A protein has these predicted regions:
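Flavin-dependent oxidoreductase catalytic cores
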Residues: 1-228
């Protein structure tokens, strides 16, 4: 829906890399990309490099154009599986995962992460450098640590520091709910683009409006009757 309404790109919801969990109607629907506008970017989560590599291959066989690795989810049920943002505490394992997935597929591999595990361990820039050196094609960084969850305001200094260290595309994420904020974040961080997450809930027009206004065009949100 966001793509249809003007977003430049959309990424799937996080899908666990364990293919034994894919045999449900919900999972089957996630693997069906009929009539979806490309590029199709599928986000995978897990902790086992081989399992993630196998999942990446399976998604490509089902039509994925991009594989996105999740290092950002802060949910406890994901952390209990040592996946999502929990991986940021194990840089050696992250490197193994990056290598395995990049070697497994012939499509671009990207990563979504947080700035670090907690405010005293903001190792996002280090992992972003690792991603670039191991062949990933883009980094999306949310401006909070895992321990921050979604509390307080996103901080963009770590994203700016990351921009100074890598040359691959960097996408800033966190609290971007207007064109003014998007423009300021891109200016302050040097990010190549912004990603909008929670801001689209109930407002799928937001990404298209921001994209249009950043390009110097005007796009008006439809009236309430049309939205309903």
């Amino acid at each position: 829906l966001c793509r249809d309404l003007g977003a430049g790109m959309a990424i799937s919801e996080m899908i666990h890399a364990d293919q034994a969990l894919w045999h449900t109607r919900k999972s089957s629907n996630r693997l069906d990309h009929t009539d979806e506008p490309g590029p199709i970017s599928m986000q995978i989560a897990g902790f086992d490099p081989k399992m993630l590599a196998d999942a990446a291959r399976a998604h490509v066989e089902h039509g994925a154009d991009i594989i996105d690795i999740n290092l950002g989810c802060p949910a406890k049920k994901v952390l209990k599986k040592a996946a999502g943002s929990a991986l940021m505490r194990d840089e050696a394992l992250v490197a193994e995962i990056f290598r395995a997935v990049v070697d497994a597929v012939d499509v671009p591999v990207t990563v979504k992460m947080r700035t670090g595990w907690d405010p005293n361990n903001r190792n996002g820039p280090t992992i972003a450098q690792m991603a670039e050196s191991l062949g990933l094609q883009a980094v999306t960084m949310h401006g909070r640590t895992r321990c921050d969850m979604y509390r307080g305001d996103a901080e963009y200094d770590t994203i700016k520091r990351t921009r100074d260290l890598i040359r691959i595309p960097l996408i800033a994420n966190g609290d971007i709910a207007s064109t003014a904020v998007a423009r300021q974040v891109m200016q302050d961080t040097g990010a190549d683009a912004v990603m909008i997450g929670r801001g689209t809930q109930g407002d799928p027009w937001l990404p298209g409006i921001i994209a249009a206004e950043l390009a110097g065009h005007t796009r008006v949100r439809p009236d309430v009757a049309t939205q309903i």
